[in-house]
Each structure stands twice: as structure tokens, then as C-alpha cells.
Design a protein with these regions (language model features):
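Positively charged n-region of N-terminal signal peptides that target proteins for export
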Residues: 10-16
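Bacterial N-terminal signal peptides
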Residues: 17-30
């Protein structure tokens, strides 16, 4: 089944409810049962996979057998698969630096429209950043509270982009599941109109934390009049790299009025993902980077997920 941007998505379900985190506890999922079981000492690698065709339409009718997962070139045994989307814990980062003054109302409206697309069991936080980073609203499922937080943005100051992403990733780490009903996919959506100018945290530190997280990062960088300027090239590199490494997507709208459509595309993507998980065939607990490749048996479609993960270390 093919879904284009803006369509209502009601993916079929293979009922397996447990996703992501709890790596320190470990999860074993029985493909024949309704609920996963927990087993200490087992580490599950969880993947949120987006599949598109050549026209970038989302493909939502694939089966478990259509997916092949490789870690460092070795085929892995998929132990859970689901087309049903678990709830989301979402961090919404909004650039409120001085250069955003004339565009801020459009950004606020687009961000508000986006949070209204969240489901009742999703939670989100709102962070705005200029020369400082402020958590306007902690994680909540209350849309009125999210609306209020977005409406409070005021433009001023420089751009602490790296600081904001770093803090948001740290906040997402605090969203811990007590049981399988509490488990959430994690996503971070960051909008900025320029390069970082005032962060204390380096891009390398941000990238390392992102690669160690379970978070898909979606980046939106507004193109200025001079896309060849050094500042924009640096911002584009940061935004594109974070998205590619974490299985998210980078957007570079030419006009601020394109923002609403961009946020709609992100909402559609989050509603179209598959969740796969496996226990690595590599038993070493060496903390090394392990590269992941997902392939599909169906021709002319492309999967996208995070590039890899760091192996656990000895407890």
C-alpha cells in the first residue's frame, strides 16, 4: 500500500507492542504471542524504519519477511516486527533568535498545527533557543499546554543550536518506560534559520550523544538568500548529518511559508514507520560502533533507519 503526503494512514497491524529502550533490562518477543517477555541480560536493538518509493510516497504494506537486517555485514534474526505505531515522545525545538523576529508568527502557527496532529497517547515538550535554551513546556500530552508554550516564544539573541539539541537529547533520555505500555518511540524535530553562533557544546559532542540515543532527529533549516555562504553550508552539514545518522530526515525549505507543509510531511512519516528489533549475533560487550544496514525484498523501494549503534559495555 502506498500513502502520499497528507493522507490518512491506518496501517495494518501485526500485534507486538514492545519497542525501543529498556536495553538494560532486555526484551525477548515471542512472534506467536501477544505480549513480549522480559529476560535480564539480553540487549535488543530496535529500529524505526521508513520505507519510500521513487516518488517518496510511504510504503506501509510490507511484511516481516520483506526485511533483511545486517549488522557489520552479518545477517541478524529479527525477533519482533510491527506496523502498529507505538506512542511517541517528541522534543520540539524552535529557534527564537533575533533573526527570526519577522518569521516567528509563521513558525508558531506551523508548530501549533503539528502538535495538533499528535495522538492522544503521545507526549511532547517545547524547547526554544536563542543565546540560551529554555524548556517552555516539559513532556505532556495536553495540547493546550503545548499551544501556550509555543505562543510564548519571543525573538532575540544569538543561536545556541548545539546546546539546544544536546539538552533535548538529555531530556529524552529521562523518558523511561516502567512497562511495555509506557514504551515510546523518540523523535526530535529542530527548526533553525542559521548556523550555531553561541553554543558551549561542540557539534562532535552532539553527534556522539545522538548516535548513542534511540532518537530519530528531523531537522529543518530555512535557506537564506545566499545558500553558498559559509554559515549556511555549516548549518546544512550539521542538520543533514544528524538526520542521516539517526534515521530522520533533513528539510531545507526556501521560504518560511513552506514550514507548515514540512511539519505535515514529518507527521506523515512518523505515522508510516515500521518497528523492527533483533538481538545482535555479536555477543561482545566492547562498546564498539556497529553499522546497521536494512534491505528489502521488494524492488524499487528504499528503507531508511539509523546508521548503527554503540555496543553495550560490560556491566
Amino acid at each position: 500500500m502506498v500513502h502520499g503526503p497528507g493522507e490518512s494512514l491506518e496501517p495494518d497491524v501485526k500485534r507486538l507492542t514492545f519497542v525501543v529502550v529498556l536495553l538494560s533490562v532486555g526484551v525477548i518477543v515471542s512472534l506467536s504471542g501477544q505480549q513480549p517477555s522480559f529476560r535480564a541480560g539480553v540487549d535488543i536493538v530496535s529500529l524505526n524504519v521508513t520505507v519510500t518509493d521513487a516518488a517518496t510516497h510511504y510504503i506501509t504494506d510490507l511484511e516481516e519477511g520483506d526485511f533483511l537486517v545486517f549488522e557489520d555485514g552479518i545477517k541478524q534474526n529479527v525477533t519482533f516486527f510491527s506496523r502498529r505505531q507505538s506512542p511517541i515522545a517528541l522534543s520540539l525545538l524552535l529557534d527564537s533568535s533575533a533573526s527570526m523576529e519577522e518569521h516567528l508568527s509563521v513558525l508558531q502557527q506551523a508548530a501549533t498545527n503539528f502538535v495538533h496532529k499528535l495522538k492522544s497517547n503521545d507526549i511532547a515538550q517545547v524547547i526554544d533557543f536563542d543565546s540560551r535554551v529554555e524548556i517552555r513546556q516539559g513532556f505532556t500530552g495536553n495540547q493546550a499546554e503545548l499551544d501556550t508554550a509555543i505562543s510564548q516564544l519571543a525573538a532575540g539573541g544569538s543561536t545556541s543550536l548545539h546546546n539546544a539539541i544536546y539538552i533535548a537529547l538529555k531530556e529524552l533520555r529521562k523518558v523511561r518506560a516502567v512497562n511495555e505500555e509506557d514504551v515510546r518511540r523518540q523523535a526530535l524535530i529542530v527548526f533553525s534559520d542559521g548556523e550555531d553562533t553561541s553554543s558551549l557544546v561542540s557539534f562532535d559532542e552532539v553527534l556522539d550523544l545522538a548516535k548513542r540515543s534511540e532518537t530519530s532527529i528531523y531537522t529543518i533549516a530555512l535557506r537564506g538568500s545566499d545558500v553558498q555562504a559559509k554559515g549556511f553550508r555549516e548549518a546544512e552539514f550539521v542538520m543533514r548529518t544528524l538526520a542521516q545518522e539517526t534515521g530522520g530526515r533533513a528539510f531545507f525549505p526556501a521560504k518560511i511559508d513552506d514550514l507548515n507543509g514540512v511539519y505535515t510531511q514529518i507527521a506523515d512519516e512518523l505515522a508510516s514507520q515500521y518497528t523492527l528489533g533483533y538481538t545482535s549475533a555479536n555477543p561482545r560487550r566492547d562498546g564498539a560502533w556497529r553499522r546497521i544496514v536494512v534491505q528489502l525484498s521488494r524492488p524499487n523501494v528504499t528503507p531508511r533507519t539509523k546508521k548503527g549503534y554503540y555496543a553495550p559495555t560490560v556491566r
